[in-house]
Curated annotation (Swiss-Prot):
Species per Swiss-Prot/TrEMBL record: Claviceps purpurea
Subcellular location: Mitochondrion
One GO CC term on file: mitochondrion
Keyword Mitochondrion included in the entry's annotation: yes
Keyword entries, A-Z: Mitochondrion, Plasmid
Name the UniProt record assigns to this protein: Uncharacterized 11.6 kDa protein
Amino acid sequence: YLFLFRFIGVDTLRRSKPPIRLNTLIPVAKVFGANFSFASLRLEILIFSGLTGWNSKSKASHVYSSSVGYSSNSIASLSIIVSNTSSRNGSWISTNRTPICLSPIV
């Protein structure tokens, strides 16, 4: 079965290059008992950077919240909710969920 853990992302993560630092995600995953391989994690973060338009001149996307899941069939997934903020009132608009698959160390 699947265990889900949620944590709130901070605004400063969008200015990181890569967008979410590897040395930040790996300890978070280890706290929840899931050990991810470094190469796989780096690959997926780069894919995530391309999907969300990070490091581009488009409107900045903010990491609103994330959930890390670890399943018993040795497949881990990371779902990140990305939202664009309105410059007028700062409310969250046009939220979409981007699934990312990470390979755990077995």
